[in-house]
Each structure stands twice: as C-alpha cells, then as structure tokens.
Design a protein with these regions (language model features):
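RNase H-like, metal-dependent nuclease domains and their acidic two-metal-ion catalytic environment used
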Residues: 1-92, 131-205
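Short alpha-helix plus adjacent loop in nuclease-associated cores
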Residues: 89-134
C-alpha cells in the first residue's frame, strides 16, 4: 500500500486560517488484502505541527506504507528525517518527473504547484471514482469507499481553489503514489548479421 499527506508547517497558535492536515492510506492491488481501497483517513489540526507529524509517522509505521507528501511544506519531511524514518517518504513518482529538473532525485515528496501534478492529481481521483466508488458499470462490481468526509470533499472540490480541500489533496496524492510507472520498451538494435560471424566457404581446387 501507499499513503498521501497534505501537511502544514505553522502551529495553530500562529496560523488562524483553520486549514487541517490530512492523511490517507490506500491499498494497491493485492491478492492478500482488500485491493484498490482507502483503509485509513485522518484529518486534524493539533496545536503543534509536530503532533500532526508524529500522528502521521505512527500511521505510516503501523501500516508499513510509504507516503507521498506535498513538499511545498517541508516541515514534515524534516521531521521524518530527524526521527530516522526518511525511507517512509516517497520521492516524486517517475511518471510525474520533469525531464530537465535537477531536483527530481534530491528532494523527497512532490510539489503541489505544478500544473502537470495538479492535472494528474484531479484525473487520478476522477478515475478512482469512476472505477471504484459505487457500482462499476463495466464490471458490475461494487467499490468500497467508507469515508464520507472524503466523499463530501471530493464533491465540493474546486481545482482552481484547492486550499481548503485537505482530504482531497491527501487522497489524490495516495492515488498518485499508487500508480504504476510504465516504462517504454527500447527498440532493440540487435542485428543478426553483425552478431553472427559468417564465413565464406572457400572452394579449393
């Protein structure tokens, strides 16, 4: 499985906006656990940001799931690093990396202000709702989505004003983290004419 986190850096005593931190944990396809479903939802704004960080860390360790975190707010990543749990923070997924960005391999997490990421995030949620919420019209299967707060957040979500939709951000990040990267196969340059040496038969008289 994998998780997604919409974090914050300022303690509630210094930030009166009321935006919460949020975390979702998600089961990817598996033969041993319920697949393609969210298994945990957490949204809170403790008085100190580090309390939120510790709550998220404990959830990640309990489930054993790595987390895809917004790196625009880097405090939670530093907290994981200081506690020795940096391996629980995912890097930017391969399919969302910018070809020429030097920061791709250095910074953990994913930026939330990239147009490509914002579009991919919205499309991931849209695809999940279509395939795994309610009855799938193509397969007839019933999806399992047990978190009403997240469903309500998805309904009200506005892609051009994402600030207050904490549950949508974290759930979408979990879905992005669960996506598989399909690498294009390189065309083989194999040439049997050069691989196998051919000898001309000498005709002796």
């Amino acid at each position: 499985g994998v998780g997604g986190v919409d974090s914050y850096d300022l303690d509630s005593t210094t930030d009166n906006r009321g935006s919460k931190g949020a975390c979702h944990l998600y089961n990817k396809f598996s033969m041993s656990a319920p697949p393609n479903m969210f298994v945990a939802e957490y949204a809170s704004r403790p008085p100190l940001a580090r309390i939120f960080y510790e709550d998220v860390l404990m959830a990640a360790v309990f489930y054993g799931y790595p987390l895809l975190i917004e790196n625009n707010k880097y405090g939670i990543v530093r907290y994981f690093e200081s506690r020795g749990y940096e391996e629980y923070v995912m890097g930017r997924p391969e399919h969302l990396k910018s070809p020429n960005a030097a920061s791709n391999t250095k910074t953990r997490g994913i930026p939330s202000n990239s147009v490509d990421v914002i579009q991919a995030h919205a499309q991931a949620i849209e695809a999940y709702v279509e395939e795994h919420v309610g009855i799938n019209e193509n397969t007839g299967e019933m999806g399992n989505m047990y978190f009403d707060r997240t469903l309500d957040d998805w309904i009200g979500y506005k892609i051009d004003n994402r600030t207050k939709y904490d549950l949508t951000i974290s759930s979408g990040l979990a879905l992005l983290g669960a996506q598989k990267f399909k690498q294009k196969k390189k065309e083989s340059a194999f040439n049997d004419k050069t691989f196998f040496r051919r000898y001309k038969e000498e005709i002796r008289r």
